[in-house]
């Protein structure tokens, strides 16, 4: 693939994550990318903008509950992509999608726009622009409603709830003063977690705040799988209750799809067929009330190694082989692996060294 501008020097597969804001989301994804791609020889994955935390802010103490977060200081010097320092102008959220489109034309292989519902005026236009396929590429969107903090919340529990805001507060002389709900600092105005996400999080001891110079990634880095499963479950429930565009829904998030893309995991809803085509293979699986349905789609036989299909129990942190012997399917042949999953179980399929597919149970809505 031809590369132009700053990206001519790239020989790796380049992913850029264009974020709303310069703290919460860039901090989260920068830390995630550092952990999973810090020494990668094949991928160049970074956020735009890079976290812009003043040195004095990064050195200040910040209470975030029962964990120590990672503080990021502004970097000076060194080689950086021009794009990382460029100010993105325009009307949100369309401006982030347009920028993600622009950098793909300059050699970026895959781009994502990460933003919240908020009160942005151009949601419909942003979604339409993202879905345009130009030169074989589209812009991927990682969207949250009410906000990114709802995605974080799903790492601690499953909740389908319509919050009014991330933080309760009021504007005084043009500046928002937050009530810090859940701390009893403003008892007359404290929503007790009924209206704002951070108030709910404080009440339940998940975190104290989310808008400082400290990354939220340490909060959930050991719960990423739980967050992915709960987010997929949330979309299933949302789809069962409304057919409105996602930018009109509350709650909603698909940030987990981006996270899964980065950590090599993909969730598949109950009853949905997943097809794998790679390395000469072509087969499909679907989970239903009888168990795991497996079909060989190619014109020759397919071998499935013992233990390729596992039942993983998240609560017990245990795995059990679903296929206790090697499976051989002729062309067009199907097989059924009987199983019934609880809410805490998923079927894990390691389709390659880099990727794991997770088939979810039939959650009660």
Task: Tell where the protein language model's regions lie, with residue ranges.
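Structured loop/turn residues at secondary-structure junctions
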Residues: 20-21, 118
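C-terminal accessory helical subdomains adjacent to catalytic cores in phosphodiester-
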Residues: 2-12, 30-86, 94-310, 315-317, ...
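Intrinsically disordered, low-complexity Pro/Gly/Ser/Thr-rich segments with frequent PxxP/GP/PP motifs
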Residues: 320-344
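Short N-terminal binding/cap micro-motifs at the start of the first secondary-structure element
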Residues: 23-28
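Conserved beta-strand elements of the Class I
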Residues: 16-18
